[in-house]
Structure formats: structure tokens, C-alpha cells
Amino acid sequence: MPRRRIIGTRKILPDPKFSSELLAKFINILMIDGKKSIAEVIVYTALKNLSKRTDKKELEAFEIALENVRPTVEVKSRRVGGSTYQVPVEVRPVRRNALAMRWIVESARKRVDKSMSLRLSNELYDALENKGTAVKKREEVHRMAEANKAFAHYRW
């Protein structure tokens, strides 16, 4: 066993506009090459567009969209004997958020719209409506876990 001390998780500073740690994490995931101010402008513009379309507050709409994309179970590879099984495991809360944010950003980048803020707002709107690529990804992960339910006893 290593004798080094256990390093705690870094505390993330809340975003300047809404004072939300969740939104700050989302901005960090969207950020490319350390250009945080550009990422902030993209996210805030997308949230403004989203709030106009849904008549909900920006942060409230974002949290609902994120909730619709969060996975509850996923599959992990586990080697038993000579074969590898896809074992369904429950996803920890921090990882749920991270996966949901990553999937939303990835699917927004794949979209074909004029600007990134428009793509992001459309993807968040689709997530609010329980449709779109990010929600499809979550459904796919859940389907995989359901299909491999028989191997759940290999959990560690």
C-alpha cells in the first residue's frame, strides 16, 4: 500500500453570475485551451436563450436538463476466469453529474447550428424535453446495464 497521504478533492469556485458550483463545473468542461471567459459567455448566452424558450429561470432549466441526462447505472468490465463481463454498477453522484455534463457538451459540439451557444441551448432544450443525443446516450447506457443484469453478482 502506498504511504503517501490521501489528497482531497479540489474545491471548485462557484460561477460569478449565479454562484453555482454545478454551473462552474459545466463551464470548465466546456472550456477549450484555458479560455474560460469565452466558455462563460457561451454558457450564459445559451442559458438566456433557454430561459426565453421555456419560461423558466436559467439555473432551474439547466438543473432540470442535467437531471434528465444523469445516468443511474453503467457497465464496467470485469475479468472473471478467461472471459470479460460487462457488470452493471451504480454510478456515484459526482460521476453522474460529470457524465451528464460531458454528454451534453459532446452532443452540442456534434450539432450543426450557427454558434456554439445556440447549439448548447438547443441541446439543453432537448434534454429538458427528454429527447436529443445526450438523453439517447443515457438511455443506451441504461439499456446496456439492463441487458447485463445477469452479471450483477460479479460486482466488487
Curated annotation (Swiss-Prot):
**GO cellular component terms, semicolon-separated:** small ribosomal subunit
Which keywords belong to this entry? Ribonucleoprotein, Ribosomal protein, RNA-binding, rRNA-binding, tRNA-binding
* Record keyword tRNA-binding present: yes
GO BP term, example: translation
Q: Which Pfam families match?
A: Ribosomal_S7
Q: What InterPro entries does the database record attribute to this sequence?
A: Ribosomal_uS7 (IPR000235), Ribosomal_uS7_bac/org-type (IPR005717), Ribosomal_uS7_CS (IPR020606), Ribosomal_uS7_dom (IPR023798), Ribosomal_uS7_dom_sf (IPR036823)
Q: Which Gene3D superfamilies did the record assign?
A: Ribosomal protein S7 domain
Molecular function, one GO term: structural constituent of ribosome
Function, as annotated: One of the primary rRNA binding proteins, it binds directly to 16S rRNA where it nucleates assembly of the head domain of the 30S subunit. Is located at the subunit interface close to the decoding center, probably blocks exit of the E-site tRNA.
Stated family: Belongs to the universal ribosomal protein uS7 family.
Its subunit composition reads:
Part of the 30S ribosomal subunit. Contacts proteins S9 and S11.
**Record-linked HAMAP family:** Ribosomal_uS7_B (MF_00480_B)
This chain's protein is named: Small ribosomal subunit protein uS7
Source organism (scientific name) = Buchnera aphidicola subsp. Acyrthosiphon pisum (strain APS) (Acyrthosiphon pisum symbiotic bacterium)
